Each structure stands twice: as C-alpha cells, then as structure tokens.
C-alpha cells in the first residue's frame, strides 16, 4: 500500500465514522437509523484475521453501509463510500472497482437501492432522502 493509498483509506474511514456519529444524533428524527450498519471490507486486517474474515463470509466488493429498511419500493439501502481526492484542477471522484460494480448491479436487480457516495455529506444526504423522500438507484 502506498502512502497516498493509506491517506485515502484513513480519510474514507473518518468520513464513515462521521456518518455513524450523525446517525446517532439523527435517531430522534429517523429511529430506523438504529439499524444502519457497516461491512468491515475497508478495514486493513493482519493476514491471519483477513483469512479468518474471508472464511467467516466477508466478500470482496460488498458495499460499506447497509440500512435494512424498506422504502419507496426498495428492500433496503446500500452505500459504497468513496473519498474525494484532489486532482490538479478539481476533485477526482474514485470509481467503483469491478467487484463493487458487480455487487451494486446484483443488489439493484434484487430490489435494493444501491448508491456510491463521495464523503460523509453525500452519504448523509442519500440516507436522509431515502428515509424521507426517495432513491434513484440508477443514477450513480
């Protein structure tokens, strides 16, 4: 892992922590946020624990966040969080990797809202819109 990869991973981690801090505060308005949960795919594990996690069912590419609450014809919400990185002229938005696209496509076919977001603010907007307004799983 390069230094820039490590920085990007730590940024994504801090953004995800901020989403859960917001969710805890927003539970008065949206009690369903009690069930917002995360996969541990983004966690860097020592090799022994990584092997154990894989044996226990961790799957590469699985989205970072899951809210198992049906809304607007969807069975639930999945979110893949990506960091915003700085390019030469404007922020670059990382793309989904092959395994992440495969999960996204599968989940959409199965009736879930599955979106990619860049940073905590976008994740919070997606969750708020999903719980209150709607979700367009085919735009991201």
Which role does the model predict for each range below?
Residues 1-140:
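Catalytic phosphate/metal-binding cores of nucleic-acid and nucleotide-processing enzymes, i.e., regions
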């Amino acid at each position: 892992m390069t230094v820039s990869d490590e920085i990007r991973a730590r940024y994504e981690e801090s953004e995800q922590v901020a989403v859960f801090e917001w969710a805890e505060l927003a539970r008065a308005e949206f009690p369903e946020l009690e069930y917002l949960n995360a996969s541990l795919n983004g966690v860097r594990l020592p090799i022994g624990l990584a092997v154990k996690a894989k044996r226990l069912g961790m799957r590469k590419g699985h989205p970072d966040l899951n809210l198992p609450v049906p809304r607007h014809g969807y069975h639930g919400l999945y979110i893949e969080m990506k960091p915003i990185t700085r390019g030469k002229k404007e922020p670059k938005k990382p793309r989904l990797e092959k395994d992440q696209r495969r999960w996204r496509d599968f989940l959409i076919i199965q009736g879930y809202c599955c979106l990619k977001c860049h940073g905590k603010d976008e994740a919070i907007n997606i969750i708020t819109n999903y719980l209150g307004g709607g979700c367009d799983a085919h735009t991201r």
